[in-house]
């Protein structure tokens, strides 16, 4: 009988840890940090300005008061076309859940330059298409602040969707604690 009780106890503990790990995985998919796939509070490791403060544009911070932000800066070139198509599909799917800015880099919209300056993941020469997600998450001290992730690559729908789903999850979890 004693062996049976120990076996049940051990099995219960194992089940608890498996369930706890599963619940933990349901939260944010990407951590806050400085790595290539992280949400960033400062310029990431691969940037020439690594660790430097980000000058968040006021129009992004204003939009962030109500929901996560997707910014897409591009030209009407062949290289940008696949990302533009992916962004358009995803933006309609997430309509109402995010604030979406599609900004031409070929016009006179000052927001294009502001976004490129603020959110270029590599520093140096800025390229398009630039895809940026901005949300809210706790920094290393636990204070909720704007975090971002961006790329100048053509990523496709899955990559964009994964980051937007995570942005929404982070936002829902942390927006009430943001002292804007």
Q: What is each residue range found by the language model?
A:
Residues 51-53, 72-73, 95-113:
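Thiol-based oxidoreductase modules, predominantly thioredoxin-like and allied folds used
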Residues 79, 83-86, 112-115, 156, ...:
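Stable alpha-helical elements in mature extracytoplasmic
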Residues 126-180:
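Non-catalytic, surface beta->alpha helical segment in thiol-disulfide oxidoreductase systems
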Residues 1-50, 166, 170-180:
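N-terminal targeting signals for export/organelle localization
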